[in-house]
């Protein structure tokens, strides 16, 4: 129990209800049947449970520990970079060591070859513990999935290992300043150079985690229009634009022409900074075309279903966590504890004993 601004807050150590998770995975979805498939033949239910338990420990120790602090001390721009509270970097390192970013990928790719449903369940714990901090690895996984699905073999070789091991992080830049809804209105331009690379110029806004010091490099997936491309959605292409360029030998080169123009204020998820980025103030930011020209929206749409599921699961995780907080509060708190006139709050009945409170808790749980 803590007291803030004169109000009693009752905390809970539970992130999610483990019994509910077991019911969903093994009784409702019959996840164990996946073990009959050749791809998961080397796994077991014990491994699934151990994965979830390890994730729960990381969520409790490295994510939940700074949820309140990260809301009170959101990222700040120091004139060069966006700085976070120390716990954010510790959480990133912990989740990288856990292997969540690449857990679904095959052993050949360096992953854990876990079923998608187990990975999703693990992410529920992380989202419930601190959904803002969890956005860093979720966007990195989305970036890796785009490159894995549509990038060239050379692009996969250069970027995927570092994205999977947490050396690089990733973002997806879609919206532009003054363009909030229609991707077909994208004005960012891309010019082809003699060496086969592109130079892009323009602005992107609402880029979540567009700048930070958690990783050595940030890989931006950016939608732009190649010069001479058709108007509308059919003329948009997808590009890889790294914050730091990569030399042929794999070492870091010079900084790309990407400038942080603004760090936007947020109502929620404050530990994930929403940024405005400027690409190519001079010659243009160096970019690498993903897949075929003019297929950018098609490629991005392929990961949207997965993104929608992840966002929805995050909402479900927060709702479940909110219910646990409400339940714990009702069990420990009595109406007299909120009243300054009470001399002996410990002997009063708890809120959970109220029929109306039970009704509200049941309604909250059902949703």
Which stretches of residues belong to each language-model region?
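Internal maturation/activation junctions in enzymes
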Residues: 139-140, 151-188, 192-196
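Long, K/E/R/D-enriched contiguous segments that form extended
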Residues: 107-109, 113-151, 155, 163, ...
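Short, glycine/acidic-rich hinge or "gate" loops at secondary-structure transitions
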Residues: 66-78, 135-139, 331-345
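Flexible, glycine/threonine-enriched loop-and-boundary segments that flank and lead into catalytic domains
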Residues: 79-93, 100-105, 171-192, 203-212
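A glycine-rich, basic-preceded beta-loop-alpha segment at the flavin cofactor/substrate interface
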Residues: 208, 245-261, 266, 273-307, ...
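A short core secondary-structure module
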Residues: 197, 201-255
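Mobile "lid/hinge" segments at catalytic clefts and subdomain interfaces of large enzymes
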Residues: 307, 314-318, 322-327
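Amphipathic, small/basic residue-rich leader segments at the start of a protein or domain
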Residues: 2-135, 158, 181
